[in-house]
């Protein structure tokens, strides 16, 4: 009985254990086990991925930091640093500028010049014309009125690049009136010389008898006066006379224009085809110098066999040559003056923290040349300080000078009174950055005068004005600074870039030397370690061999 009870209990416990096993095998417990398995697999996979990523990083790091790569980088950095010391980034920029590639900043700035040039015009009012014609005053007296301010707009178009490393384009200049900057009433009247009549008489003073007879008839018919009253606007833009208009209708070949307005004549034909030098083959000194003007190398209107002056080597004033020195002479071409104007180094100065050079127009620019090659003289000869400009104005008797006859060989009261020459107000100069040839400020001041020849063959009132030079007006072309983007670019290129390039080049050199030195030191250290290991192993091998021989010897002796 006791055995049966025990057997029953054992069966119960067995069944209980079986039930508990059944409960463990239910679906919930199975899913838990599967999730735990998934989690374990995920963790293992993540750990494996991390390990693989670390391995790849270590491999890349090992590749990047390998001795061969370090050696290549070291040599490359040293070569780059030496090259940057020899050929600096500034040299590269100046060389690239020579090509004038469309889309690059130098070309874009030139193709659309900034509106920075102001034209200030001053006219002369005659105050004693009646007394002068009556013989009460020996000389005319003039007073200056102005300025009348315009913006001179410059347009570049029709650009084409030639095979001989030159660039041809069309340059057009025209003025735009600026009412906000003007205090002069253009409707105000002034007394001025009758430029059309006096100019035609002076132009034809050596004409034949028939031509002079026609002119006398016109004078008798219209009875013009040597001095007239006109508005300032008409004097500048619409100045004519019935005698001039009739003369042009009768003999248009002798009288090419009927409107003698001062600015009207200056800007009547100011669309010019220019050809300039570009490209590395010309070098920095000849960059953007004029090679042809309207297809010709000489100044327009002059005979190349008589006048040795050539227009090539000059500049229109927008861009100058690069790498200028204090010994360089800048040739400035302005059709208004009809001659090349030389500028010489004057002083060093700083504007906007940029070191600059100032070049002044020679005070002898209008003097006579004594070697027989004076292209700007007339017959009879002009006074020093005057330059013939008639070749650019249909042979009309016009001469150029400094404003108020400043400097030159003309005393200020030689022809008229009332002039007040002042070096500060009447000289011309350009201030530019010498490496890039960028003009920061430029002022060109010129005076136009009427040259009156001997008029004794006409009425007495005209004869009184004979053999004189009458100031008509003078103009100032002033480039007032630069746009901020150009100024900042020049500042960075000249002031910031050179020391910055030295720092970068020096840093590259030091890093290259460091990499090579480190590599050499590491190789020497590895060689020493290898030698030590080989020596240690060889010593161990010898000791082991000695021990083996000793053991074999001892065994042999015992056996014996």
PLM regions: where:
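PEST-like, low-complexity acidic/proline-rich intrinsically disordered segments
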Residues: 1-16
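Extracellular or lumenal secretory-pathway regions
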Residues: 21-355, 362-552
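Intracellular C-terminal tails of type I single-pass membrane proteins
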Residues: 550, 554-560
